[in-house]
């Protein structure tokens, strides 16, 4: 039996769980992001060992990129602009999709978020800008779009 399918089911379940949890609570708990990260690295080791280094670099670059944004904004504005769960979620997505897909993933997530802001403005006006916008659902959606290329097409 091919080991890919159980890994992809785990990826889908954890990503949907993170999508729903962040949309409802505004949090991305470690108990969901950490298993997603480790399962992504294990997936590469078991199913595609040639890409393990790329998956590891994906986790490092994903974490590092969003950590710089998180801390830079926090230092400059004295408040959070991006949750640290988003930092860990991008690290996990980097482990699954490798570093080569991270630019596309972040661009898609940001595009989805901008679209949601525009829809919110059109439907509720400026009131919609007063509430923080969870970024996790957009990362999860972008992960599924990018996953079509990176995971199902064999990287």
Swiss-Prot record:
Listed GO biological process terms: signal peptide processing
Highest rank taxon of the organism: Bacteria
A Pfam family of this chain: Peptidase_A24
One annotated Gene Ontology cellular component of this protein: plasma membrane
GO molecular function, one term: aspartic-type endopeptidase activity
UniProt similarity note: Belongs to the peptidase A24 family.
PANTHER family: PREPILIN LEADER PEPTIDASE_N-METHYLTRANSFERASE-RELATED, TYPE 4 PREPILIN-LIKE PROTEINS LEADER PEPTIDE-PROCESSING ENZYME
Protein name from the UniProt record: Leader peptidase HopD
Taxonomic lineage of the native organism: Bacteria, Pseudomonadati, Pseudomonadota, Gammaproteobacteria, Enterobacterales
